[in-house]
């Protein structure tokens, strides 16, 4: 089947590649969209093109659109809705477009979890699942896991002849608890859920350990990764020897070394040959390995530096090979096999425990009628596929075939972040093969940074390698390389780095021409957009500065350097391009973001920036449990649960709640030195006081014990949330913390604790003890309850955020800091590791000697996981660099800059763009990659003079380097203090603060400034017609509700106890409107019939009995006795209570003064009635204002009042109907029920 492709319209704003992604079809399509390439816009346009095509258009509910987040789904729906509205404006009579707008809200545009939930709701009976199930809160799931796991282990401990289980417990738990085993079971369970068939995957774990003495180690799955690692290390050793040989061959080089170095080269070649053969031979070759001594270089013709460098290179080669000998190949292959055989029962036992836990956990969830997010995917999978015993394969079920028939195309956003389960679901609901399919995937594998959530970027990469540009062999791939976000300097710099560091062996993909970012924006010239690399050297200080410099953390040093640069940016000033105005403007603090790998040091960074006068903030969700007010309340709750806890009890007594001082606590302890502190407290209360000080302390202690008993009783009888709020009231702690610095945040923290308690009790769990245990579990895992403070886009502050949080965002100026911080590799050294392919691996623990050894699978997974970690870190670095629109700063702090540069020099002369695999694989930080790449650039000459390949040195990118000493940063801080000192002294002495003229003038300008568009500050972007009416008049049918009068000013709707009294005019008017909306127009219009219909509205609870009594049936009869009333009953089309939204120029509603030019407001309203007959469309609005009494029967005065009050409103109604419905309104009327007459509105 050939790929379908619609030609690009003339004058289209889309690039050729973008249009191809929009218009291509007929097969599975993978769009590799680089950062800033407009992938979301392309995806939305593809959907719009499909549903708005004049030929072959599809309904939007025949598309399945899968997004990564709910926010992305909402945004996509909004964009599609706006596009449909625009298209409808061009084709107002298109019923198809109107239908798409009506279908949009129920279209399948959602996260995959939401789609799975819809599938389960529809086919729950296939799972024997209670249809009233609910999605459990994370708290409830964690507590239920804990319960099930405890139950499982108790059963195992109680079994007789359970030797294998106890062997596992002895091997993998400590002496005091089995927490390590619990963590292992939960980790393996969670990991298994990322597989489409978790039970089968768990059962298959043992197969890798099914070996015997005759097995060849080199044929086992782990051996492939060990061999790849060994080959990389041998290649590195060969490279070092080659460099040493090149030095020996130089005119003044160590020529006597040449023979020995060639022997070394032969030795390495022999090891490489053996690596691809028998590992038995390789083992013996490595164990018998011996490097000969280098011969001496006698005489004066040798360069000492070249001799030392050659020796160093050979030593590096020797270390590589010796590391292989002493680690990977330290055991004979037969020993590896023996360990694997002995591990087999261990793996079988652990896998069986996890499978039992899985079954028990699912049963517990079913019993409670709950599911978790993992269940959504797996239950959906059970519905969509069925096992075929004849072929031994899974096939789409009848439900899956229904979805295949339902959806004309399946579109997936952020495809690089899908996992194997999600991929399986997508494959089941799509049609056909890759060559004939309807799966459209868009993403950027270089931005796949969620492997820790078990995302699988290899799914994207595998397709990218298989698919072709023309799609003839199968699926089609389309590269979107044009970046419309960043300046050319940022893109060139990013390309220069990644062309050198990202490769297939280390990085999982090649950063080739197709992957490189291409400049597609249209920035004006004149901005200094050169990326800057700033390295803080801690050792470049004078002797007396060493102690202070050593105390400064890297984050603080980098923050001080950032502060200097940010001050320059704002004051110099630095200009950024504002796309909304199309003009350059001065950079503001909000244009700047600081990106960090983790938020560990973010509070210190913010503190440093603020100390330098720079407003800075972060969405911090950590530090909640460390907050004083939360620590105190949790201690109090622990004491209420169990007062025999010394530390919480002492913390509560010492806290502001009870204010015991150190002397009083000492008195209490002396009352019973050996018992618990609570026992000492009880003894102290029974003791006779000997001094006034003791008497005072005793009164406080007795008061505390009385309160504690009261609270303990309350904890048994009332809800947890009630208890916590009562504690706030009894102790007045909530009010107390509100008066402290940061009081609002502290009170918000206490409210969050209360809310969390309520949330906890909404689950199937209860009780203070369980809640405290849950909190402890959160703290043990490093989780936090703190809600991040959302920052508005317009807050003029420097933002500090993680690279992960920045994904999908863009900022004019980016500071990427902490580049020398080591990668987090601690997980690689865990006693056990998990891998989708290699399964489960752990250290072998000798049952008698209690000595542990790494097993071959464990080593293999370590090697594999390290490469995966490095690939992930490369992608995270790519995301960070591509957030910058105009300026990029890279910051690092190192112990010795000279030593770092010396390390980088080793690769400066390497030929070819890609740095050697071993160099990239040995990186311990981002700086290790960046430094080695940039040293090869021509601008690296400012750091060191070395030979550089011309092709690389002449790259069009431009860089600026700066080495900054820590002493300079410290001195800068001192000088700042001195500048402020004069002002501080003046203030202390009560004298005027000396100011410079320009600052005084600036202060005056700011204080006297008035906002140009002041009127806009009191005008909302969305206005109802009623609000517009009330802003233009002082009384009407709702006057009693809003008009301030002497003695009363109702602000809220009336409470229930007042509703027994007489209804207000507005409430009576509302009741009449309800009747007019629901009247049967084909029924007789007499009082009896209308009364009967009103009674039915009361029975349907659309009206209260009190409201019904106020409705004047005779007035309604009078309305329908008119000519227009009769026309309404006979009309071919009748619409009642018609809502509308209409965008209008603000100056048209409020006048141009005080309003921004071009500002539009959204006006909303509801038209009481619209009908159409042979004369055209008629608009009617009912009014219940009292006019007969007010104007003493003077109809002309009443008419003038009503038209003056409501004429503008009616003209808006007419305009809305005409613009939105695209039909002319022939007649427009007000009807006054009080006067029983119509008023025509022109």
Swiss-Prot record:
Residues spanning the membrane: none
UniProt xrefs under PROSITE patterns: UVRD_HELICASE_ATP_BIND, UVRD_HELICASE_CTER
Coiled-coil zones: none
Entry GO terms, CC: cytosol; DNA helicase complex
Requisite cofactors: Mg(2+)
Keywords: ATP-binding, DNA damage, DNA repair, DNA-binding, Exonuclease, Helicase, Hydrolase, Isomerase, Nuclease, Nucleotide-binding
EC numbers for this chain: 3.1.-.-, 5.6.2.4
Molecular-function annotations in GO: 3'-5' DNA helicase activity; 3'-5' exonuclease activity; ATP binding; ATP hydrolysis activity; double-stranded DNA binding
Domain UvrD-like helicase C-terminal: 514-808
Binding site for ATP: 33-40
Record domain UvrD-like helicase ATP-binding: where: 12-487
A Pfam family recorded for this sequence: UvrD-helicase
UniProt catalytic activity: Couples ATP hydrolysis with the unwinding of duplex DNA by translocating in the 3'-5' direction; ATP + H2O = ADP + phosphate + H(+)
GO biological process, one term: double-strand break repair via homologous recombination
Subunit annotation: Heterodimer of AddA and AddB/RexB.
Entry's family note: Belongs to the helicase family. AddA subfamily.
Function according to Swiss-Prot or TrEMBL: The heterodimer acts as both an ATP-dependent DNA helicase and an ATP-dependent, dual-direction single-stranded exonuclease. Recognizes the chi site generating a DNA molecule suitable for the initiation of homologous recombination. The AddA nuclease domain is required for chi fragment generation; this subunit has the helicase and 3' -> 5' nuclease activities.
PANTHER family to which the protein is assigned, alphabetical: ATP-DEPENDENT HELICASE_NUCLEASE SUBUNIT A, UVRD / RECB / PCRA DNA HELICASE FAMILY MEMBER
Designated name of the protein: ATP-dependent helicase/nuclease subunit A
Organism this protein belongs to: Geobacillus thermodenitrificans (strain NG80-2)
């Amino acid at each position: 089947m050939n790929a379908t492709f619609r030609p690009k319209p003339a004058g289209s704003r889309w690039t050729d590649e973008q249009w191809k992604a929009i218009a291509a079809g007929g097969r599975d399509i993978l769009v590799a969209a680089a950062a800033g390439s407009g992938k979301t816009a392309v995806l939305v346009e593809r959907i719009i093109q499909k549903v708005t095509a004049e030929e072959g258009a599809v309904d939007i509910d025949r598309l399945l659109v899968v997004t990564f987040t709910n926010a992305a789904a909402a945004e996509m729906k909004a964009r599609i809705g706006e596009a449909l509205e625009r298209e409808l404006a061009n084709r107002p009579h298109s019923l198809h477009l109107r239908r798409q707008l009506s279908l949009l809200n129920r279209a399948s545009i959602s996260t995959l979890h939401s789609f799975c939930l819809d599938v389960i709701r529809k086919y729950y009976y296939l799972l024997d699942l209670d249809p009233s199930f609910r999605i459990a809160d994370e708290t409830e799931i964690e507590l239920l896991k804990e319960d099930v796991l405890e139950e499982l282990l108790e059963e195992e401990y109680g079994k007789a002849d359970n030797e294998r289980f106890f062997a596992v417990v002895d091997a993998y738990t400590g002496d005091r608890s089995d927490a390590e085993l619990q963590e292992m079971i939960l980790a393996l369970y969670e990991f298994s859920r990322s597989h489409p068939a978790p039970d089968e995957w768990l059962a298959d774990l043992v197969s890798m350990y099914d070996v015997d003495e005759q097995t060849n180690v080199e044929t086992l799955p782990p051996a492939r990764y060990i061999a790849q690692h060994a080959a990389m290390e041998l290649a590195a050793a060969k490279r070092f020897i080659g460099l040493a040989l090149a030095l020996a061959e130089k005119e003044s080089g160590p020529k006597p070394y040449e023979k020995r170095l060639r022997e070394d080269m032969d030795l390495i070649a022999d090891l490489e040959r053996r690596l691809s053969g028998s590992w038995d031979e390789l083992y013996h070759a490595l164990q018998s390995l011996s490097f000969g001594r280098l011969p001496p270089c006698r005489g004066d013709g040798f360069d000492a530096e070249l001799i030392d460098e050659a020796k160093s290179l050979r030593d590096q080669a020797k270390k590589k090979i010796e590391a292989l000998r002493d680690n990977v190949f330290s055991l004979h292959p037969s020993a590896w096999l023996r360990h694997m055989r002995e591990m087999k029962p261990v793996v079988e036992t652990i896998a069986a425990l996890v499978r039992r836990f899985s079954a028990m956990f699912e049963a517990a969830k079913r019993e409670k009628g709950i599911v978790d997010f993992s269940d959504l995917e797996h239950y959906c999978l059970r519905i969509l596929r069925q096992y075929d015993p004849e072929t031994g394969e899974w096939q789409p079920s009848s439900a899956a075939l229904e979805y295949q028939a339902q959806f004309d195309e399946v579109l997936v956003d952020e495809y690089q972040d899908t996992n194997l389960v999600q991929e399986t679901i997508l494959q089941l609901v799509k049609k056909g093969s890759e060559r004939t399919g309807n799966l459209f995937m868009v993403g950027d594998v270089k931005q796949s940074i969620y492997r820790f959530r078990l995302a699988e970027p290899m799914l994207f990469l595998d397709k990218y390698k298989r698919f072709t540009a023309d799609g003839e062999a199968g699926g089609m791939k389309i590269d979107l390389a044009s970046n419309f976000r960043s300046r050319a300097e940022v893109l060139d710099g990013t390309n220069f780095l990644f062309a050198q560091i990202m490769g297939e062996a280390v990085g999982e993909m090649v950063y080739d021409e197709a992957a490189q970012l291409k400049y597609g924006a249209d920035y004006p010239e004149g901005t200094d957009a050169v990326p800057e690399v700033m390295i803080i050297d801690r050792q470049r200080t004078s002797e007396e500065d060493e102690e202070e410099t050593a105390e400064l953390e890297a984050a603080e040093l980098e923050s001080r350097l950032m502060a200097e640069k940010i001050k320059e940016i704002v004051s110099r000033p630095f200009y950024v391009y504002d796309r909304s105005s199309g003009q350059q403007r001065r950079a503001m603090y909000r244009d700047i973001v600081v990106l960090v790998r983790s938020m560990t040091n973010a509070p210190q960074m913010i503190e440093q920036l603020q100390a330098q006068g720079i407003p800075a903030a972060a969405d911090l969700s950590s530090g909640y449990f460390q907050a004083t007010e939360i620590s105190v309340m949790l201690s109090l709750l622990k004491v209420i649960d169990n007062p025999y806890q010394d530390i919480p009890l002492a913390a509560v007594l010492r806290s502001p709640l009870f204010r015991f001082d150190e002397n009083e606590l000492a008195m209490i302890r002396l009352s019973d030195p050996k018992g618990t502190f609570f026992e000492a407290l009880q003894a102290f209360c029974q003791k006779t006081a000997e001094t006034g000080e003791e008497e005072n302390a005793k009164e406080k202690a007795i008061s505390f014990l009385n309160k504690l008993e009261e609270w303990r009783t309350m904890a048994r009888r009332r809800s947890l949330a009630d208890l916590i709020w009562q504690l706030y009231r009894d102790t007045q702690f909530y009010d107390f913390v509100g008066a402290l610095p940061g009081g609002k945040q502290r009170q918000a923290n206490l409210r969050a604790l209360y809310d969390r308690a309520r949330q906890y009790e909404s689950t199937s769990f209860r009780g203070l003890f369980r809640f405290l245990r849950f909190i402890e579990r959160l703290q043990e895992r490093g989780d936090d309850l703190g809600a991040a403070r959302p920052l508005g886009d317009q807050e003029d502050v420097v933002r500090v955020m993680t690279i992960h949080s920045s994904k999908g965002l863009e900022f004019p100026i980016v500071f990427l800091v902490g580049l020398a911080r080591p990668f987090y590799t601690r997980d690689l050294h865990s006693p056990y590791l998990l891998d989708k392919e290699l399964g489960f691996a752990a250290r072998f623990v000798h049952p008698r000697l209690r000595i542990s050894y790494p097993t071959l699978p464990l080593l293999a997974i370590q090697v594999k996981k390290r490469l995966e970690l490095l690939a992930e870190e490369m992608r995270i670095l790519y995301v960070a660099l591509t957030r910058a629109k105009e300026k990029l700063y890279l910051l690092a702090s190192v112990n010795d800059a000279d030593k770092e540069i010396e390390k980088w020099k080793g690769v400066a002369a390497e030929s070819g763009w890609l740095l050697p695999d071993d160099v990239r694989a040995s990186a311990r930080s981002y700086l290790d990659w960046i430094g080695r790449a940039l040293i090869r650039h021509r601008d690296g000459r400012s750091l060191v003079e070395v030979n550089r390949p011309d092709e690389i040195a002449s790259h069009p990118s431009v860089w600026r380097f700066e080495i900054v000493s820590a002493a300079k940063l410290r001195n800068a801080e001192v000088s700042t203090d001195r500048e402020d000192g004069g002002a501080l002294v003046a203030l202390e002495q009560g004298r005027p603060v000396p100011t410079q003229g320009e600052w005084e003038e600036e202060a005056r300008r700011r204080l006297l400034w008035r906002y140009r568009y002041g009127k806009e500050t009191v005008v909302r972007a969305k206005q109802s017609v009623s609000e517009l009416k009330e802003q233009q008049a002082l009384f009407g049918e709702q006057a009693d509700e809003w008009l301030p009068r002497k003695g009363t000013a109702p602000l809220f709707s009336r409470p229930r106890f007042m509703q027994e009294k007489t209804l207000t005019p507005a409430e009576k008017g509302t009741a009449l409107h309800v009747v007019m909306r629901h009247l049967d127009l084909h029924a007789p219009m007499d009082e009896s019939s209308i009364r009967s219909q009103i009674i039915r509205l009361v029975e349907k609870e659309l009206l209260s009995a009190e409201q019904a009594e106020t409705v004047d049936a005779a007035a309604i009869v009078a309305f329908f006795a008119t000519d227009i009333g009769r026309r309404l009953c006979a009309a071919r089309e009748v619409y009642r209570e018609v809502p509308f939204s209409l965008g209008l120029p603000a100056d048209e509603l409020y006048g141009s003064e005080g309003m921004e030019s071009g500002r539009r407001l959204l006006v909303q309203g509801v038209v009481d009635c619209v009908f159409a007959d042979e004369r055209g469309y008629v608009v009617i609005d009912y009014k219940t204002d009292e006019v007969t009494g007010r104007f003493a029967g003077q109809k002309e005065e009443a008419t003038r009042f009503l038209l003056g009050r409501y004429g503008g409103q009616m003209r808006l109604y007419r305009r809305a109907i005409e613009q939105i419905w695209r039909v002319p309104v022939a007649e427009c009327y007000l009807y006054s029920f009080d006067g029983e007459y119509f008023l025509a509105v022109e």
